[in-house]
Structure formats: structure tokens, C-alpha cells
């Protein structure tokens, strides 16, 4: 009986790995063994960084809100505290978008937060 080496399956798997490493440098996109190592690392980084992106975005929103709040004479903490006291439940993503694209509405929200903080 002839030995079965899995030629078609192996070829497909190799093609898939080489396709995934298309933009990689040097042997990492042309030799299967190096390409597979490169792909495993790349996928690992992609997995971790998809989760890290959530924190990156939150930090960006907070930075934008803080900058807009300081333009209104409040700090980020004072603004958030005032919003909580006033019972205004707007998340950071919406607040940051408002600060960038609709500064008039953000100023109105900040004024309500300042009034609630003063009382």
C-alpha cells in the first residue's frame, strides 16, 4: 500500500499561511516555516491589541473631554461629577464626539454640570 502524505491538504494549508503573511519582510512571506512563525506571532499581537484598543479609545475620549471641559472652565473630574449629580447619563464616547463635532451642545451640557456642582 502506498504511503499517504496528505499532499492536497498540506498544500492548501501552506498556501493559506503564505497568503496571510503576504506583506511580511524577507523569508517571512516566502518560506513556510518562517511564515508560520511570523503568522502565529502576528495573530497573537492582533488578539492582544484588539483588547488593548478598548483602553486606548477610552483614554482618547477622556483626553478629548478634558480638553473641551477645560475650555468651559471645568476639569474632567468636575465635569463628570457634575453630570452625575445632575442626573445626566451620557457615556464618554458620546461626550467626546460631542466635544469634537458639536461644541455648542457640549457647552450646554458643561453648563448644566457646573450648575449641579455649584448647588
Curated annotation (Swiss-Prot):
Tree of life domain: Bacteria
GO biological process terms, semicolon-separated: ribosomal large subunit assembly; translation
Matches recorded under Gene3D superfamilies: 6.10.160.10, Ribosomal protein L20
Keywords annotated in UniProt: Ribonucleoprotein, Ribosomal protein, RNA-binding, rRNA-binding
InterPro entries xrefs: Ribosomal_bL20, RIBOSOMAL_L20_CS, Ribosomal_protein_bL20_C
A cellular component annotation (GO) from this entry: ribosome
An MF annotation (GO) of this entry: rRNA binding
UniProt xrefs under PROSITE patterns: RIBOSOMAL_L20
CDD domains: Ribosomal_L20 (cd07026)
HAMAP family linked: Ribosomal_bL20
PANTHER family tied to this protein: 39S RIBOSOMAL PROTEIN L20
UniProt record similarity statement: Belongs to the bacterial ribosomal protein bL20 family.
Function per UniProt: Binds directly to 23S ribosomal RNA and is necessary for the in vitro assembly process of the 50S ribosomal subunit. It is not involved in the protein synthesizing functions of that subunit.
Protein name stated in the entry: Large ribosomal subunit protein bL20
Upper lineage: Bacteria, Bacillati, Chloroflexota, Dehalococcoidia, Dehalococcoidales
Amino acid at each position: 500500500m502506498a504511503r499517504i502524505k496528505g499532499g492536497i491538504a498540506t498544500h492548501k494549508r501552506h498556501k493559506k499561511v503564505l497568503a496571510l503573511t503576504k506583506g511580511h519582510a524577507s523569508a517571512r512571506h516566502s518560506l513556510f516555516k518562517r511564515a508560520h512563525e511570523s503568522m502565529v506571532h502576528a495573530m497573537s499581537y492582533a488578539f492582544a491589541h484588539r483588547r488593548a484598543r478598548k483602553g486606548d479609545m477610552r483614554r482618547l475620549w477622556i483626553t478629548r473631554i478634558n480638553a473641551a471641559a477645560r475650555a468651559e472652565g471645568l476639569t474632567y473630574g468636575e465635569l463628570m461629577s457634575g453630570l452625575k449629580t445632575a442626573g445626566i447619563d451620557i457615556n464618554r464616547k458620546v461626550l467626546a464626539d460631542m466635544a469634537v463635532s458639536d461644541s455648542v451642545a457640549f457647552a450646554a451640557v458643561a453648563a448644566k454640570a457646573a450648575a449641579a456642582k455649584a448647588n
